[in-house]
Design a protein with these regions (language model features):
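Helix-turn-helix/winged-helix DNA-binding modules
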Residues: 31, 52-53, 80-81
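Structural recognition of an alpha-helix C-terminal capping motif at a helix-to-coil junction
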Residues: 49, 63-70, 83-95
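A short, glycine- and basic residue-enriched loop/turn
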Residues: 44, 58, 62, 76-82, ...
Length: 118
């Protein structure tokens, strides 16, 4: 069992290796939809895991994951290889998750205020 888990972890590290993701980012910046599909395939678990760790809600984490890849598609031309492509993508997902949490807080505050008015 431990060997299987170690193998899976190694496969995940290999799938998100910067030397594999960098060319995808260049293709993505050129509008290559297949590059987006491959980037999604290689990084979706990491992006979803980060979103879920912030949001603690599967539905919201799925929304943030989808939105992160949409933003990556729209802004790939702005990617600068100062870090890794995965770090860039996770930063997008983190920012979207934080926005979702702030939005959730405002909604809850409004509902509480409405409740107190009754």
């Amino acid at each position: 069992m431990l060997i299987l888990l170690e193998t899976m972890a190694e496969e995940r590290r290999t799938a998100t290796a910067p030397e594999l993701l960098e060319p995808l980012m260049a293709r993505l910046a050129g509008g290559d939809q297949e590059a987006l599909a491959e980037l999604y395939h290689r990084t979706r678990t990491s992006v979803y895991g980060l979103a879920l760790s912030y949001l603690k809600n599967q539905h919201d984490a799925e929304d943030v994951t989808q939105d992160a890849f949409v933003r990556a598609w729209e802004n790939a031309h702005q990617y600068r290889p100062q870090g890794t492509p995965l770090a860039w993508l996770l930063t997008i997902a983190r920012n979207l998750a934080l926005m979702k949490l702030r939005e959730r807080g405002r909604t809850q505050d409004m509902a509480l205020e409405d409740w107190e008015r009754l």
